[in-house]
């Protein structure tokens, strides 16, 4: 037998045996739930988003189920796909969407550049990786020549304006007087509410020390449905929205080798953030978290993306595999939404792009990020003060909801969105008379008013009865 073949078969058997051994053991828990999979060699938990979503659903009865989310999203994905194909047929160039980012570096007083208090350069190396991956940049690790590979046409920019209107570099260092955050529920209960920036204007990333006893790399919060017919909205999760990543897995050794990375080396190239932000934009693991090769209509029960081949488990390492040999195509181990090593990953697909586009168009907190201007020049103090004093009354409203301002500073304009992100009213504001918003023709339900002042905006929720 060929020596190379023998080694390959032996390695495959070894990895399979390792996977079996780990599954046979008692798997670790996060958020009070047994994790679905760990790396069979290192024991690391690649992602805890599925477990986190179960935790959020238990904590908040208004948070919709995955099935309800998919039912809400499915027609919007088809609409996004139709638009993409129409644009391709006319060679139309899509506008690149900008997502403003704030990175909260959570530390315990360690000197800058020591342990969890990572340097600005390590943070910025991660932003570079995100842009390489989400833009499928040529001559970078984010490039691929797969026919279904997609440029998601999303760029991440560090915020230049903080919530008070002051200039910032988008890196928010916070001394929380706590060595580690191995208790994940403390992150939701204490850390996030104390540090989160307005999630309608900033994409929040928390970089923390999970502690030596934790093998967790990171996790994310799925997008809001922004309301479903006959169901309550789950906007209550706003102050926890974003991604949380262990500092050892944030940034790129390729770009900034001086950073503080995990010594085993396989997760030090920035793909944990690429993966977790994919979840925030609506993407699922390519295996669908269900361990089967059974596919339904439109790849249902899996990741809802037909152009990612059927996969019945999470893949680790970089070994090519075909876990569903009776289905078309081998496992797409290079997909950012699998569990493989960072250096194996290089692709989002066209159908994954459709899904992301649907979320960015229809999920209110995701859609509002695209209109945020905090990545541009610093706003005036007057603009910030005018927005900070704005409230709505009465709420709930019947025939009118009033925009209440402090002082004589009026906003410039407002837009009213329904619970699925559609514009139902808008107006420029030139006098106090424009601050009374007529709601008599609106159906009962949840609505959002985005109020603009100069380069800034503020989004408020109201209920029509």
Where are these regions (language model features)?
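Bacterial N-terminal signal peptides that target proteins for export
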Residues: 2-10
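Bacterial N-terminal signal peptides
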Residues: 10-18
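Sec/Tat signal peptide C-region and signal peptidase I cleavage site
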Residues: 20-24
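Propeptide-to-catalytic entry region of secreted or membrane-anchored zinc metalloproteases
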Residues: 25-201, 208-209
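Stable alpha-helical elements in mature extracytoplasmic
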Residues: 119, 123-126, 187, 269-273, ...
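Metzincin-family zinc-dependent endopeptidase catalytic domain
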Residues: 128-315
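C-terminal outer-membrane/trafficking sorting elements
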Residues: 383-393, 397-465
């Amino acid at each position: 037998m060929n020596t190379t073949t023998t080694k390959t078969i032996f390695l495959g058997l070894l990895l399979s045996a390792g996977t079996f051994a780990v599954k046979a053991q008692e798997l670790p828990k996060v958020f009070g739930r047994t994790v679905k999979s760990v790396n069979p060699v290192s024991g690391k938990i690649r992602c805890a988003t599925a477990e986190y979503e179960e935790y959020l659903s238990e904590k908040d009865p208004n948070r919709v189920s995955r099935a309800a989310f998919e039912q809400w999203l499915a027609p919007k994905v088809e609409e996004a796909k139709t638009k993409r194909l129409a644009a391709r047929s006319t060679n139309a160039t899509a506008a690149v969407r900008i997502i403003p980012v704030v990175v909260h570096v959570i530390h315990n007083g360690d000197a800058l550049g020591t342990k969890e208090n990572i340097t600005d350069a390590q943070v910025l190396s991660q932003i570079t990786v995100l842009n390489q991956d989400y833009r499928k940049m040529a001559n970078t690790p984010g490039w691929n020549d797969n026919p279904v590979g997609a440029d998601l046409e999303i760029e991440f920019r560090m915020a230049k304006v903080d919530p008070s209107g002051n200039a910032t570099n988008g890196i928010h260092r916070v001394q929380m007087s706590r060595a580690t955050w191995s208790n994940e529920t403390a992150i939701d209960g204490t850390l996030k509410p104390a540090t989160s920036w307005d999630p309608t204007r900033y994409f929040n990333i928390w970089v923390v020390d999970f502690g030596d006893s934790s093998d967790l790399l990171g996790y994310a919060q799925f997008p809001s449905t922004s309301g479903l017919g006959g169901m309550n909205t789950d906007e209550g999760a706003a102050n926890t929205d974003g991604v949380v990543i262990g500092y050892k897995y944030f940034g790129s050794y390729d770009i900034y080798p001086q950073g503080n990375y995990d010594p085993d080396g396989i997760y030090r190239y920035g793909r944990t953030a690429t993966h977790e932000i994919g979840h925030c934009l609506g993407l699922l693991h390519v295996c669908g978290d269900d361990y089967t090769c059974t596919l339904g209509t439109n790849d249902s029960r899996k990741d809802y993306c037909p152009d990612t081949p059927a996969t019945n488990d999470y893949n680790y390492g970089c070994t090519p595999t075909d876990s569903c040999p009776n289905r078309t195509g081998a496992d797409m181990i290079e997909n950012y939404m699998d569990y493989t090593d960072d250096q194996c990953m290089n692709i989002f697909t066209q159908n994954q792009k459709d899904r992301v586009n649907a979320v960015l168009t229809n999920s209110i907190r995701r859609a509002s990020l695209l209109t945020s201007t905090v990545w541009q020049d610093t706003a005036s103090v007057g603009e910030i003060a005018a927005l900070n004093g704005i409230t709505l009354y009465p709420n709930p409203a019947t025939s009118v909801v009033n925009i209440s301002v402090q002082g004589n500073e009026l906003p410039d304009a407002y837009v009213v969105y329904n619970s699925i992100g559609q514009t139902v009213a808008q107006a420029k504001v030139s006098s106090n008379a424009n601050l009374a918003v007529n709601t008599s023709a609106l159906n009962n339900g949840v609505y959002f008013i985005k109020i603009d002042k100069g380069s800034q905006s503020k989004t408020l929720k109201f209920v029509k009865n």
